[in-house]
Design a protein with these regions (language model features):
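Catalytic domains of carbohydrate-active enzymes, especially glycoside hydrolases
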Residues: 242-267, 363-368, 450, 525-532
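Substrate-binding cleft of secreted/luminal carbohydrate-active enzymes
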Residues: 448-462, 471-477, 482-554
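Active-site-adjacent "subsite" loops/lids of carbohydrate-active enzymes
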Residues: 220-237, 313-360, 519
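SH3/SH3-like beta-barrel superfamily modules
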Residues: 67-100, 138-174
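Boundary regions of SH3-family modules and the immediately adjacent low-complexity/disordered segments
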Residues: 39-44, 91-118, 161-219
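Aromatic-lined carbohydrate-recognition surfaces of secreted/lumenal glycan-active proteins
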Residues: 233, 305-315, 370, 397-436, ...
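SH3/SH3-like (including bacterial SH3b) beta-barrel domains
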Residues: 58-70, 127-139
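Glycine-rich, aromatic-flanked loop segments that form ligand/cofactor-binding clefts
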Residues: 256-261, 287-335, 368-372
Length: 554
């Protein structure tokens, strides 16, 4: 055997010895490490769970260190949960903090431990999309929590999924409280006592049962509402001649237009929403959506604030397409009341239809949606007395509750989309009672961005030889003073923006209403403190009448 071969064998043996020594040293080191250093426990991903917005955390001795936000993702020691330990270790940097086992959830869906919440205001639940309104809930009603839809950075629930004996659905966090006492309390007990004392004088509902909790309002970014709106009204035909009306308004004080989207049977454009809900309305359209959009845009391009008007619970087309939605006799035959058919204000599908339509139309260029005919029919008293009317009242609500709850639902959706909401009411509504048709000024003004009374002088009854339509200043001023008194009775009143009579009186002696009479109406409103503006009501949108009176509208 050569010397080279012997050297190779000797070198290989040395390598083996070295490797064996290293293995032995490693094993010895591991034994020593295990003896003096505890094993690193296995951790799992989880979420902080709590009935409140945070969960307390403790040190090893049980002293509270602070809190963790509900819903925060953490790493926790799995064996602490599995073994039923009194505290669960949660990784905190290079060490641990400790929480109660109940404050750890394996899934995000288990982060909210609240079992019951309470409705802050009377309203309707909605489905997961927030689009379809569901069952009514009453102020202070207990709602069983069945889930939630998101948490904010502070651990607050964004929306609660709840159920009650009437149904199930979603409700936003701002509309619930965690105790029945908090939910049932009135925001302003002194103001509430005023409403409660009024009761139910005319069958429209008890003022005590309406909601007076403030509605969050305010400027919408990118959508500026004038402090005083000075508007001409354009029906569905008139908007097709937008250029002509803009020439009339040019250089005057007019800064806005009210444009019909739908006015009873008069449909301004072929709406896809109408095609879905009411094909006969779609078929009756006076113009295409494209043309309608272009004409609305002309008003916007001229710097005008544009309001879209929708009649809600007066709809002959919907009544024809869906008679099951309509106020009827006890056999289900729709009743024609005051020469109209009335989809019930209790019907949630009607709510959704009109709000879907509002959102579709608003996207065509409107700043605001104005809801008209937000009421039950006048003229139903004889049917009520005879017990021969079916209002389709599923949840036992009053008329005024249905009107207010529709507005709460619609305003939430429209505000979320960046549009203002206004509501038209009878001039009578400025009085200190709930009207027979379900309108109560403080409850409506509390929800909308602007409330629009219709104190047309020729709509008031004569008192002997005194004819209110012969005294436009006095008639409108009296209304304005009453309206401002009602405004003081709610915590979040909308602007008072009033319809003024812009047509010749329809009652003897058929007074002419020209620039002087309209100037009296405008001055009366301002003198009474109704500073939100005015809108000219002329059903025909008579351009010659507008030319005649325009000097009074600056």
């Amino acid at each position: 055997m050569s010397t080279k071969t012997e050297k190779k064998r000797g070198g290989g043996a040395a390598v083996v010895v070295i490797v064996l020594c290293l293995i032995a040293l490693g094993a010895l080191g591991y034994v020593i490490w295990r003896q003096f250093c505890p094993a690193v426990p296995d951790t799992a991903a989880g979420y902080v769970a709590s009935a409140g917005t945070t969960a307390p955390v403790y040190d090893e001795k049980g002293e509270q260190l602070g809190s963790l936000v509900r819903g925060a993702e953490v790493q926790y020691v799995a064996e602490d949960v599995e073994s039923g330990a009194e505290r669960v270790r949660v990784v905190n940097g290079e060490g641990y903090v400790y929480v109660a086992p109940a404050n750890i959830a394996a899934d995000y869906s288990g982060a909210v431990l609240t079992e019951t919440v309470y409705a802050l205001r009377g309203m309707s639940l909605v489905d997961e999309t927030g689009v379809t309104p569901g069952c009514a809930v009453e102020k202070g009603m207990a709602l069983t929590v069945t889930g939630f839809d998101g948490l904010d950075e502070a651990g607050q629930v964004l929306r609660w999924r709840v159920s009650c004996d009437r149904g199930e659905g979603y409700i936003s966090n701002e509309n619930v409280r965690l105790t029945q006492e908090e939910a049932a309390a009135q925001y302003d007990a002194e103001a509430y006592a005023i409403h409660a004392a009024r009761g139910d004088a005319w069958g429209g509902g008890d003022a005590a049962d309406l909601d007076y909790y403030p509605t969050e309002k305010g400027p919408i970014p990118g959508n500026d509402m004038p402090d005083e709106v000075r508007a001409l009204y354009l029906n569905g035909s008139a908007i097709q001649y937008a250029d002509s009306y803009l020439r009339v308004a040019a250089g005057t004080g007019i800064n806005a237009f009210v444009v019909d989207i739908v006015d009873g049977t008069a449909v301004s454009y072929a709406s896809p929403v109408m095609q879905q809900y009411s094909p006969s309305a779609y078929a009756a359209a006076q113009d295409t959506m494209e043309n309608f959009r272009a004409n609305v845009q002309k008003l916007r391009d001229a710097g005008c604030y544009v309001i879209g008007r929708i009649t809600v619970f007066n709809d002959a087309h919907l009544a024809a397409d869906h008679p099951e939605y309509v106020i009827s006799d006890l056999d289900g035959t729709p009743l024609k009341i005051s020469s109209m058919y009335w989809p019930s204000a209790y019907n949630r599908t009607v709510w959704q239809y009109k709000t879907d339509l509002a959102l579709e139309a608003a996207a065509l260029g409107f700043n605001e949606i104005q809801f008209d005919y937000i009421r039950f029919p006048d003229g139903a008293y004889k049917y009520e007395q005879a017990g021969t009317i079916d209002y389709k009242n599923t949840y036992g609500e009053s008329k005024a509750q249905a009107v207010q709850r529709f507005l709460i639902y619609a305003a939430q959706r429209l505000h979320d989309a960046g549009y203002y909401v206004s509501g038209d009411v009878f001039g009578e509504c400025a009085n200190a009672y709930v009207t027979a048709c379900g309108q109560y000024w403080p409850a409506i003004s509390s929800v909308v961005d602007a409330i629009s009374g219709m104190p047309y002088p020729d709509h008031y009854s004569a008192q002997g030889d005194y004819k209110p339509w012969e005294h436009p200043y006095t008639t409108v001023h009296n209304f304005g003073e009453s309206a401002m008194a009602r405004q003081s009775e709610t915590a979040s009143p909308g602007a008072v923006r009033t319809w003024i009579q812009c047509y010749n009186a329809i009652r003897e002696p058929y007074n002419h209403y020209g620039a002087a009479e309209l100037a009296d109406e405008v001055r009366a409103l301002r003198d009474a403190g109704c500073t939100g503006g005015f809108m000219t009501w002329n059903g025909a949108s008579d351009i010659d009448k507008y030319r005649e009176v325009i000097s009074a509208l600056s």
